Amino acid sequence: MELSEGNLQGLTEYLKKTLDPDPAVRRPAEKYLESVEGNQNYPLLLLTLVERSQDNVIKVCSAVTFKNYIKRNWRIVEDESNKICEADRIAVKSSIINLMLRSPEQIQKQLSDAISIIGREDFPQKWPNLLTEMVNRFQSGDFHVINGVLHTAHSLFKRYRHEFKSSELWTEIKLVLDTFAGPLTDLFKATIELCNTHANDVGALKVLFSSLNLIAKLFHSLNFQDLPEFFEDNMETWMTNFHNLLTLDNKLLQTDDEEEAGLLELLKSQICDNAALYAQKYDEEFQPYLPRFVTAIWNLLVTTGQEVKYDLLVSNAIQFLASVCERPHYKNLFEDPSTLTSICEKVIVPNMEFRAADEEAFEDNSEEYIRRDLEGSDIDTRRRAACDLVRGLCKFFEGPVTNIFSGYVNSMLQEYAKNPSVNWKHKDAAIYLVTSLASKAQTQKHGITQANELVNLTEFFVNHILPDLKSANINQYPVLKADGIKYIMFFRSQIPREQLLVTIPLLIAYLQAESIVVHTYAAHALERFFTMKGAATTTLIVAADMMPYVELLLANLFKALSLPGSTENEYIMKAIMRSFSLLQEAIIPYIPSVISQLTQKLLAVSKNPSKPHFNHYMFEAICLSIRITCRANPAAVASFEDALFLVFTEILQSDVQEFIPYVFQVMSLLLEIHTTDIPPSYMALFPHLLQPVLWERTGNIPPLVRLLQAYLERGATTIAASASDKIPGLLGVFQKLIASKANDHQGFYLLNSIIEHLPAECIEQYKRQIFIVLFQRLQSSKTTKFVKSFLVFLNLFCIKFGAIALQEMFDSIQPKMFGMVVEKIIIPEIQKVSGPIEKKICAVGLTKVLTECPVMMDTEYTKLWTPLLQALIGLFELPEDDTIPDDEHFIDIEDTPGYQAAFSQLAFAGKKEHDPIGEMVNNPKILLAQSLHKLSTACPGRVPSMISTSLNAEALQFLQGYLQAGSVSLV
């Protein structure tokens, strides 16, 4: 694509169409842009539109399209072609910083994000001048430009907070510090000075405080991994100014908005974060500054209001106190009982209160409320911070803290008892305080795993939680109902089984509660109960416990999916899945109704899949229905196919990318249940499964390979008879997969099924080409993973077609190649093969090479016979060699760039591991002994002679053990 006016105009028109609400207009435009994004100059055309277009909408659209293009294509992935030519890469990097800094804020943010994506891949090696170019702009004096640089630097450096330590990372951080830390500190001081100069100019202050907020964020990123020498030397400058900013109260920066945090609140909360980082990680160096920060942050907490806009600030301020009180150095600051009482009264209790804003979220934004309250994303909430502070204080002062707080709990409960309808929030706070006091350690899987022994959890449950849950009106006091359910869910590992069983019928009833939060918590609690471990391998709650409730449980779970706001509630669907798994055969009488409802739901959500977890659990539930029913009655598979295939056809024809990998897995499960030949409905689909477009999507590959394996296992004769013209297509898929380091193992799965199941005459003409393809890959890109799979394939081929066929195949491609493979690949690498079935295949195959291949005894290959036997005994007896060469790395599926529906393995569609040898060989060691005995009988004297002269003593001892176990000897 040339950088021409015509192309700019054409691109403008297509970008306009991508904004059209009509899918008939929008989708073709999106497809067109997708089709041309591989052309040279495409990114430069987008940047030209960002710079020159007169239409602001097109400018923004171009910037967003450019950022997404960079996100999808900039990373160079091994095995894949470079999606952006080198000339475009150089041109983009040479122009983007200038363009970003000249652009308005809305566009600047998009381009800044694009720079950080490029920097993540190219900085510092391929973009060494990036930082210098950015730092030079600090001198401009233009804070629009400076903030653009700071925003980009923040995007670039914030990953330092999350990355594991490595020499490579530290080298990069050192380079950044050498170039950036000094100018950043100078800018910090200059900006503080300007704030003092312009203290009465609200416009200037807004720009300057935006800069200070970004500078404070950069400070956090650059100090996160370790305390850099530069910042240690300049701690006085940074900490003094941070402290001054914490205590600053400029009325001009206060906002009337009760929801949205202002610039001053954002800056102060970031400073609290920075102080907490230093208190936790660099307490010795930070000690001189700590008392003044504790005082400033305490004053901040007792003077800040309850408005939502202060939530982040208060949360970070409390988290600072929590991190300080956990350190042995500082415990003397908190040990006075009056201090503990003051903290409880002035910080913890006020910030545990259920505010009007929380009530509003509970009722009107339940999804967000659940996410924060149940899933632990409440990291920035006042309640979570107050809870963390309670736990922190309990580390050194558990007894005094429990006594003080118990008094508050009793007082709150008494207030509630006086007038429940008015004072229910007191009980809510009491439950939250008890939960905070009692929980010392928690996991997602088990709830609270370690509790404060000074708190009697069961007594509190019986006296204060159970009465609420037993209330006849399931819709009264919904917040307290949710609190009660959450309490028993959190402390399920501490509460006796008998009490849990009492709550099960109550929870089933709460599935019908009007409140989304309440019926969601009920579903989640049931699901968690059903996964609790009991004695040995059983669950704590077993199917027999649930027998009185099966019908009501299933009915209420499915009814809950029709309640307003819960039509795609992932917790309910997960509870359905877990109920099926626990109840097993008990659900069979309800399957016709259940599968009908699941199918209707599948059809509805396939129109616009938006809840990935819900969708995943739905497919798991479908798989469980199939497995449980067909285990008892395999013929029932036909009724599932009747119910599901219409919806599956719709999904495949509409190309619902998110669901296609799931559909293939369910179809594999159904096909594997068939015991006779493949039904015609499957054979009609077979040619479509080989279409290249399906294999372009990474997420389709594992389930598609499994589905093709199911076709080969169940219907090889049908394929050979009526679809032999599709065998080249099958091998084409194998060839594509084998060329990829990420997917070569999938290629071998498919190839092994082809070799094992298709009649020999069907693949005779292709065998040589298969070996050539494998050798080309071995020569161009040898990896441990490939070699392991290659060895399994060779031995499977040997078992299927015989050792002579294997040797002749190699030597027909190139003379003496068989010897090279045995010497250079099989003998040195066989120890790397892992997995019992894979090892068994290799053992049987190598036994055949040793004992059924005449050239191993009578030609120059004879010198390899004993080393090969030694290697086979090593495979039996030595630990697996799991070393991987230093220079080798594997590309994971997750690393493929851009959005692709990732493959999600369905646990309940799991494939039983297939053993191609099966009962033919139970003990490969005995097989080796018997085969050597047979060989030695055919050529007396030779085998004992070869073994005694070349096999090492330890291997010889093992071999004698095999011969003894097999009741045979060598002659």
From Swiss-Prot:
One of its GO terms (biological process) is protein export from nucleus. The keyword Cytoplasm applies. It comes from the Eukaryota. InterPro entries: ARM-like, ARM-type_fold, Importin-beta_N, XPO2_C, XPO2_central. Keywords: Cytoplasm, Nucleus, Protein transport, Transport. Its main location: cytoplasm. It is found in: Cytoplasm; Nucleus. Pfam families: CAS_CSE1, Cse1, IBN_N. GO terms for cellular component: cytosol; nuclear envelope. GO terms for molecular function: nuclear export signal receptor activity; small GTPase binding. Residues 29-102 form the Importin N-terminal domain. Export receptor for importin alpha. Mediates importin-alpha re-export from the nucleus to the cytoplasm after import substrates have been released into the nucleoplasm. PANTHER family: EXPORTIN-2 (PTHR10997:SF8), IMPORTIN-7, 8, 11 (PTHR10997). Belongs to the XPO2/CSE1 family. This is Exportin-2. It comes from Xenopus laevis (African clawed frog).
